Amino acid sequence: MNRVLDLASSYAVSVARAGSGMAVGALGARPERPLELYEFEACPFCRKAREALSILDLDAVVYPCPKGGQRFRPQVEKRGGKAQFPWLVDPNAGVEMYESDDIVRHLFTRYGDGRVPWSLALAPLTLVSGAVASICRPLSGVRVRPSRAPERPLELWSFEASPYCRIVRDALCTLEIPYLLHNVAKGSPRRAAFVARAGKMQVPYLHDPNSGRSLFESADIVAYLDETYALEHGATARDVGADGGRRVSA
């Protein structure tokens, strides 16, 4: 996608969702272990779960499940009984669940003050604005691209409403690259620690523990992901095994 169009459509998503996930809300107890979220970027229901994580300043290991993906989708179907997204695993509460509304309620009850913000609580409005947001980027973060699986999950500092972070998440999603998501929305008490690590308050910020590389700038991050993990052009999803290796006929 053209860079200007990519940015414009990403901004449009943020506008459609009225900036939900841009700032931290009231925080409650903090989880001892990161949550796990199986989702794909373009899904409006998955977006609700990600917005809740951003508002509640929660980390999560994200397992991208784009259409046609074979790396993590089968795990969801095996554990939950169906390939439906989002799928949240909370090891701190011992729960696993589908349904974005149930996920949002669980997160705000356990990790917030129990009150779900209007941007996530008004079901008809949320459904319509979420659908409009997805229409703004109809081809982004939807279908799998053949890729090599990293040995260890990457790390991404981000917040849901940022149009630049969204572009990076699109790339991670279509390449089925798992990553530890560190949410640092406006008002996050963890921003100071992030600045101490990265040197400035700017997101997206990607760290790849497999190569030791750390990068700012969405365009540079996407180029790095393509260069490091995308397989050659022309490969199809069925050519690539669930572990990211190329299938070879016997």
PLM regions and their residue ranges:
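GST-like domain detector, emphasizing the conserved glutathione-binding G-site
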Residues: 1-161, 166-250
